Regions:
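Extended repeat-based interaction scaffolds and adjacent low-complexity, acidic/S/T/P-biased segments
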Residues: 3-4
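Short beta-strand His + acidic residue motifs that chelate non-heme Fe in jelly-roll/DSBH
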Residues: 146-149, 165-168, 184, 189-195
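Short, conserved beta-strand element in jelly-roll/cupin
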Residues: 137-143, 149-166
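Short acidic-glycine-tyrosine-enriched beta hairpin
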Residues: 130-132, 156, 170-189
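Exposed loop/turn and edge beta-strand positions of beta-sandwich/beta-sheet ligand-binding modules
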Residues: 114, 134, 153
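Double-stranded beta-helix
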Residues: 195-263
């Protein structure tokens, strides 16, 4: 990162970006797109005209966010967690208000009610500016389906949650653990779901950041959302009931599992 104003002081956000950069540098050879992410981080500059306004985060959303941060326990992610805590007061969290989708996109009630994101580097609404690159954090509530979708922007996810489910290119669902990386090339379809913990991740759009996301309709959305809703009700009734409703794929949720997808 560089600075437009040499008098700008070090911020919690810059330290957070540095922690993310350090994590990605150690995995630079695992996915080709990481090199582009790192190059764009290095070429970002302090935003001179930052608008920090955003929707007020509700008490429930704040509780969900704090739970997601507390759930970051994998050793490789602890510097990011600690930097995130120090930068909390500098971050502005927003819900997607048709910024990433057209206004008529049916993303499901779970997504609409619980999605939050904050930007660290972006063309707008971030402390650091890049004309065509974004880096930030994305949050979804527990037991939520983020429906199958695609976008022109190549995308990197760094999973921070203990476990999250992913469906890539319409294939089978597979679970990934904390520290795992997901790479989606341009217009590659992907979906994710959370279980009894919030879904929390670092995300980055490498280029084409002004392109909108589009849904890739699947016939099983209603069933998936009903299953997640039933698991949510079971968790309210007592966590001792929850293991009976969780997916069988938990052994795949290994730390540092990495999937590489070709563009």
């Amino acid at each position: 990162m560089s600075k437009r104003d040499s008098t700008s002081k070090e911020s919690g956000v810059s330290s957070l970006i540095a922690a993310i950069k350090h994590f990605l540098t150690s995995r630079e050879e695992t996915i080709p797109g990481i090199k582009d992410v790192l190059a764009n981080i290095s070429s970002s500059v302090v935003a001179n005209n930052l608008c920090e306004s955003g929707q007020a985060v509700s008490p429930n959303q704040q509780k969900m966010l704090q739970a997601a941060i507390s759930n970051i326990e994998h050793k490789s992610l602890l510097p990011i967690r600690d930097s995130l805590k120090l930068a909390e007061d500098e971050l502005v969290w927003r819900q997607d208000d048709s910024t990433y989708y057209s206004a008529d996109a049916d993303l499901g009630e779970g997504y609409k009610a619980s999605n939050l994101h904050t930007l660290l580097i972006a063309p707008a609404n971030a402390k650091y500016y890049h004309p065509d690159f974004t880096l930030g954090f994305f949050l979804l509530g527990p037991f939520t389906l983020y429906r199958d979708h695609f976008h022109l922007a190549p995308e990197l996810y760094v999973n921070l949650s203990p476990v999250s489910g992913w469906r890539l290119d319409g294939g089978e669902w597979r679970d990934y653990g904390a520290g795992s990386l997901i790479w989606n090339g341009p217009n590659e379809v992907h979906a994710t779901r959370s279980y009894d913990h919030p879904f929390f991740s670092i995300f980055s759009w490498v280029r084409n950041t002004r392109s909108l996301c589009k849904l890739a309709e699947k016939p099983d959305w209603e069933k998936l959302e009903k299953d997640l809703h039933d698991k949510k009700l079971a968790s309210i009734g007592g966590r001792d009931r929850l293991p009976d409703t969780m997916p069988d794929a938990m052994p795949d949720a290994m730390p540092d599992a990495t999937i590489e997808k070709n563009e």
